Amino acid sequence: GDRFEIWEAFSLSYPLFINSIIVKFLNATTVDGYNPYRITNAGIDWEVIEPENPWSNIGYWGDHQIIYLLKLLEISNKHTPETLSTLLNERIFAFANVPYRLKSYADIVANPKDSIVFDDKLHQQVLSLTPQIGQDARLVLDEQQQVLLTTMADKLLITLLAKLSNFVPNAGIWMNTLRPEWNDANNALVGYGASMVTLAYIRRYMSFLQEFIVSDVNIATETYTLLQALHSALRMPSTKQVTDMAGLAGEQYRQKAYAGLSGQIVTLPLCELRTFLSDTLEVIDSSIRNN
């Protein structure tokens, strides 16, 4: 996280590095739309539970990937407006293979302070593969044991859709990944809090995407399904219907992502993306106004 804060300042001083930084950032997001604990010289790193250390913990700081990424995207757009958008449909982006598994929606509702399972088997697999393939062992691999690659558009949308699957109307983004939001006064409310600050940043992120994406984009078929499910969910009449349908859409996406993404890419027409963004912004704006 702190590295990302430094990157923001660094990229203002050295703007030509900005797009490399964004690529590095996106290559470190997970299939379920979060960021690993840190990036070191040895690659992507995550926390593990240490039985002898009462302070050890696992989880995701939910706001990082929206806020820091957005700042970097805005800086890039200001300094080299055309360059970044040429990467939108390039299949050059990998996924961090963090061995955390978010539970089902029903389980998270039942106990939002116990929402993530540490996948010890996957953790051991990664460790045993590392001597053979190096840092690539910490990335998601396809059936041929090659690094699974997707487009920048897919990455940008997965991050957004993961957040929207935790949207609670008039409350904000539900903080259910065992970590507080860094930028929110409700810092302590892990599991039971919802962040209005992150919702406001999502609003800004979506406004950015409206300007930034000006043609059809190629995304994973699983992402497309999630986008359509959330589009329906967010237009439901009651708060409970929105929250339940969005939460279940997120769960169904995660089940597919954890089992192994197909690698199939489909075209999301610009008109459909724009309708989704504008409809969703209306719902978000109503929540922001009500607060």
Question: PLM features: residue spans?
Answer:
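Acidic, mature catalytic/reactive cores of soluble proteins
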Residues: 1-291
